[in-house]
From Swiss-Prot:
Species assigned in the record: Aquifex aeolicus (strain VF5)
NCBIfam families per the UniProt record, alphabetical: atpA (TIGR00962), PRK13343.1 (NF009884)
Gene encoding the protein: atpA
GO cellular component: plasma membrane; proton-transporting ATP synthase complex
Predominant localisation class: membrane
Annotated site location: Required for activity: S363
Compartment(s) of residence: Cell inner membrane
Protein's name according to its UniProt entry: ATP synthase subunit alpha
Protein family (similarity comment): Belongs to the ATPase alpha/beta chains family.
GO biological process terms on file: proton motive force-driven ATP synthesis
Protein keywords: ATP synthesis, ATP-binding, Cell inner membrane, Cell membrane, CF(1), Hydrogen ion transport, Ion transport, Membrane, Nucleotide-binding, Translocase, Transport
Topology versus the membrane: Peripheral membrane protein
Length: 503
């Protein structure tokens, strides 16, 4: 066995230490002194930032939610199992962010960006902070392009524009989600990407909804963010912000996106739960004082950007569930005041078989009128008025025995218009067909047709237009307004169809 000389040993040591660089790694840590109900409190972490991700010694993550004088309140992302008093928690220096990019289209993810659809890892372009300041006034442009929902009553009387925030409000089981899903399905042949955020819903209901989107081919342009009823309140609180961040990627790159928050009532409840556990002072209905700011900072991120920034848009359809039709409760009034209008769904109408159960009197679109195509404006201008007059007369008729001819005529027309606006769920109708149908309704083509035959008239009219007069639909699509020549063609087509139609 060869022995090393003193010089050789020295040379080996010299070589070993030549490349050595002393590395000092400093980590700011804290100690957990309380854990329970999805939250933890820790001493230390003196320089932690608000909404910074922190890591527990078992690998679980949390968010610094409350920064107090002597401790930090942390909301735990996921299960609290394995976190105990005395455990070390350390800073990561990273603010909560979400993956964004076109790779998320067609995927189902949780609010932390983990895939839930079994289709492998998420392909994304970069990660973006979930809390962002909304675009300022100078960066915006007034809403002027239509976002077609495929729902006759909405496209005609409560039009929605790209970049608008339109609230869908109503009691449970009145068809709120159906209106939102119809709007997603109506984007099939457009350039709009869709994001559906499910907050606090049953997993079975979410699974049914994803299956429907896949069956209709809508998952090709849709991303679903899921925080179900069985997920912790922390994930339910984060889900809308994550969905919004995904939508902003499209908006900021000159594209168009639609986001649905289903629903913000459960989102507010999750935030209330976290705030009360953090000992924040409760206000009205035990919600914290900043619950208005919670929703306003989220919904203000939906915008139509100006041409210098690429003219992209993010349209938001938040959903609010009311209790027994009480729209004057705290959260409904908050969100009504933040949004640019509301679609009010009524249980009474739903139970009468008027579906979608939209109360046209209470529903309004404050900015959508500027986005509605001129052809629809021309045919639907009198529709709202005729329906309002019909509702008044309907109440009056209950007490009056004899009616004059004009009143009877108005009631007959109203009954047919109500029937005309009924629609099967998950069956969006192209706006060109809607225009011809509503033209028929408001110009008396249905007045002598029995009410029960109106739906048959509608179905056969669409088939007639597709097979024999596709030129009319094409012309409406191209011109986007009714001139004398086009109106003449529509009248000729309706006259010809009506002669063939058998009620």
């Amino acid at each position: 066995m060869a022995t090393l000389t003193y010089e050789e040993a020295l040379e080996i040591l010299r070589q070993q230490i030549k490349d050595f660089e002393p590395e000092a790694k400093m980590e700011e840590v804290g100690v957990v002194y309380y854990v329970g109900d999805g939250v933890a409190r820790a001493y230390g972490l003196e320089n932690v930032m608000a909404m910074e991700i922190v890591e527990f010694q078992g690998g679980q993550q949390g968010i610094a939610f409350n920064l107090e004088e002597d401790n930090v309140g942390i909301i735990i992302l996921g299960s609290e199992t394995g976190i105990e008093e005395g455990h070390i928690v350390k800073r990561t220096g990273r603010i909560l962010d979400a993956p964004v990019g076109e790779g998320l289209v067609g995927r189902v993810i949780d609010p932390l960006g983990n895939p839930l659809d079994g289709k492998g890892p998420i392909q994304f372009e970069y990660r973006s902070p979930v809390e962002k300041i909304a675009p300022g006034v100078v960066k915006r442009k007034p809403v002027h392009e239509p976002l077609q929902t495929g729902i006759k009553a909405i496209d005609a009387m409560i039009p929605i524009g790209r970049g608008q925030r339109e609230l869908i409000i109503g009691d449970r089981a009145t068809g709120k989600t159906t209106v939102a899903i119809d709007t997603i399905l109506a984007q099939k042949n457009s350039d709009v990407y869709c994001i559906y955020v499910a907050v606090g819903q049953k997993r079975a209901a979410i699974a049914r909804l994803i299956e429907l989107l896949e069956r209709e081919g809508a998952m090709e342009y849709t991303t679903v963010v899921v925080a179900s009823a069985s997920d912790p309140a922390s994930l339910q609180y984060l889900a809308p912000f994550v969905g919004c961040t995904i939508g902003e990627y499209f908006r900021d790159n000159g594209k168009h996106a639609l986001i649905i928050y289903d629903d913000l009532s459960k989102h507010a409840e999750a935030y209330r739960q976290l705030s009360l556990l953090m000992r924040r002072p409760p206000g009205r209905e035990a919600y914290p004082g900043d619950v208005f700011y919670l929703h306003s900072r989220l919904l203000e991120r939906a915008a139509k950007l100006n041409d210098d920034l690429g003219a992209g848009s993010l349209t938001a359809l938040p959903i609010i569930e009311t209790k027994a039709g009480d729209v004057a409760a705290y959260i409904p009034t908050n969100v009504i005041s933040i949004t640019d209008g509301q679609i009010y769904l009524e249980a009474d109408l739903f139970n009468k078989g008027i579906r979608p159960a939209i109360n046209v009197g209470l529903s309004v679109s404050r900015v959508g009128g500027a986005a509605q195509i001129k052809a629809m404006k021309q045919v639907a201008g009198t529709l709202r008025l005729e329906l309002a007059q019909f509702r008044e007369l309907e109440a009056f008729v209950q007490f009056a025995s004899e009616l004059d001819k004009a009143t009877q005529q108005q009631i007959n027309r109203g009954l047919r218009l109500v029937e005309l606006l009924k629609q099967e769920p998950y069956n969006p109708i192209p706006v060109e067909k809607q225009i011809v149908l509503i033209y028929a309704g408001t110009h008396g083509y249905l007045d002598d047709i029995p009410v029960e035959s109106v739906r048959k008239f509608e179905k056969e009219l669409y088939a007639y237009l597709d097979n024999e007069r596709p030129d009319i639909l094409k012309e409406i699509s191209e011109k986007k307004k009714l001139d004398e020549e086009l109106e003449k063609k529509i009248k000729e087509a309706l006259d010809a169809f009506k002669q063939k139609f058998v009620p």
